[in-house]
Amino acid sequence: MAKTLTLTHLFNMPSDAKARVAGKTFVGIDFGTSTTVVSVASLDENGKIRSECLHLAQRGADGAMIEAELLPTVIAINDRNKLIVGKGAYSLKGNPDYIFGENIWYQFKMELGKDLGPRWFNSRQAKIKCPQDATKLFFRYLKKCIEDTCKANGFSADIQYAVSIPASFESNQRKDLLEALEANDMCVTNSMLIDEPNAAFISYISHDYEAKQINLQEGRIPKVLVFDFGAGTCDISILEIAVSTSGITTKNISISQFQELGGSDIDRFIAWNILLPELLKQNDKTEDDYTTRQLEVIVNQLLGIAEKLKVQACKAQVQLRSAIRYPV
């Protein structure tokens, strides 16, 4: 007889599960290269796992406080020496007054694990000299957001954290991340770091995707290919799913090697190969009119536009496919 794979099957709940989780708040953090998302999980009255995204407070592009599920992984220091994290900082990407490594920082997640010492000597924030510093400061802000949101929603202040990471995050990268969390009293052990493809698979079979169930046949050991394309990495993982008398278990049997391939690379390609040539053409200039350093500054200012162009192109492609009716 076939079994349907659900979170309840994947995580066998002991009879005293509710008693074990009572008085605790379980928070999952998707620490992304470009965007961070936080969710809270709980058991409903039927013992099923339920999760919901937290709306995190942050300043918008106009400086007003807003709440949103998506927190851009961007830090900036404004002209009043005030720290800005999230959407407000993201809106400053491309602003000529904000120079990467001086008063705005992003994509620092992918630089963890590189013991190169201070990287940003011109930083206007004394506490941000390397990617590890930026990560610590980002999590300080994130922790405050999580605690405030949990308090406002009546959740317990006893928060247990889990953080998703690229599938092949190396040991030194994990070490830097754990140190950044520990520096902010966010107790996370190495076992609470979950590979992003595994997290994507769990999300796939969660209650939000009841229409996309996976049926397991007895006597068969199916394998699932998980393709996780993020801003900083492209992770591919093959999971093996087994059914036994004790329930359903999964394990990784193959994981792609870590590689710097992701959405940010597409942004840079668009900026260098589409936006920059068009900008130079409209101003009767060529690349020879600028130094390599000047071109890098210009391209960095175009990255925000490139990302928006990429997103709009993807949305247009989805709409086009939805509009096409193929013959049966």
Task: Explain the meaning of each model-derived region.
Residues 52-184, 266-328:
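Phosphate-binding loop and its immediate beta->loop->alpha context
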Residues 150, 167, 177-221, 229-230, ...:
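Hydrophobic, small-residue-rich alpha-helical packing segments that form membrane-like cores
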Residues 6-13, 18, 22, 137-153, ...:
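Phosphate/ATP-binding catalytic cores across multiple sugar-kinase/actin-like superfamilies
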Residues 27-29, 159-166, 193, 224-228, ...:
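Extended hydrophobic secondary-structure segments that form protein cores and membrane-embedded regions
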Residues 40, 173-177, 202-206, 237-239:
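Short acidic, glycine/serine/threonine-rich loops at helix termini
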Residues 243-261, 310:
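Charge-patterned, long linear interaction tracts outside catalytic cores
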Residues 17-49, 101-103, 209-251:
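Gly/Thr-rich phosphate-binding beta-strand-loop-beta motif of the actin/hexokinase/Hsp70
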Residues 1-82, 159-160, 168, 191-193, ...:
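Nucleic acid-processing catalytic cores of prokaryotic defense/repair systems
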